[in-house]
Amino acid sequence: MELNLKRPICFFDLETTGIQVAKDRIVEISVLKIHPKGLQEKKTWLVNPEVPIPSDATAVHGITDEKVQHAPKFKEIAKDIYQWIKDADLAGFNSDRFDIPMLAEEMLRAGVDFDMKNKVSVDVQTIFHKMEKRTLEAAYRFYCDKSLIDAHSAEADTMATYEVLKASWIGIRS
C-alpha cells in the first residue's frame, strides 16, 4: 500500500546523548523523505555533539566519542537538514514526545527557525497504541505468550496481572 500524499513526508529518527531534550544532544539523524509520487530519498548524518557521549547512551546506539570526533557539529549542518525537511510533514516513532522537541531544541541552539506551524506530525507510536488492544488479555499474550483463560473472572485477572508484572519486570530489570 502506498501513502496518498499531497506533500512530502519525512520519516526520521534521532540517536542522542540522552533523553533530556534541553540538555542532551543529537549524535545521529536519519531522514527518509517520501514524495507524493512515491520517490524516496534518504540521508543520514553523524553529528559531533560537542559533549562526551555517556556510556549508557553508547550501550543503546553504539555511537562512541571516537566515531563522532571528526563528524560535523549540529550547528554546521542544521541549515542543510532544515532545507531538506522544510517542505515536508514529519513522522517518527515517539516523535511527538521526543524526536521533534529534540530536533527543535537543536535547531534553536543553531539559530535555525524550525517552524512546525504548517506541518503535520505523524507519531507512529501513537497510532500503534490506538490500534493495538490495550487489555489485560493483550498484555498477557504479549508478556507471557499465553492466552488468558477465564478473562474477567477476578481470580484469573488477578493471577494474570501478577504474571504480566513478573514478566515485564524481568524485561525492565535486564
Short names for language-model regions:
Residues 151-154, 174:
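Short, charged, surface-exposed loops that flank catalytic or proteolytic processing sites
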Residues 12, 122, 156:
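Active-site flanking residues adjacent to catalytic metal/cofactor-binding acidic residues
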Residues 1-4, 164-174:
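Acidic two-metal-ion nuclease catalytic site recognized across multiple nuclease folds
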Residues 116-128:
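A short, structured active-site edge motif that brings together acidic residues
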Residues 1-118, 133-152:
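Conserved non-catalytic scaffold segment of RNase H-like nuclease domains
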Residues 153-167:
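Acidic, divalent-metal-coordinating active-site segment for phosphoryl/phosphodiester hydrolysis
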Residues 16-18, 126, 160:
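Short, glycine/acidic-enriched loop or turn micro-motifs at the edges of active sites
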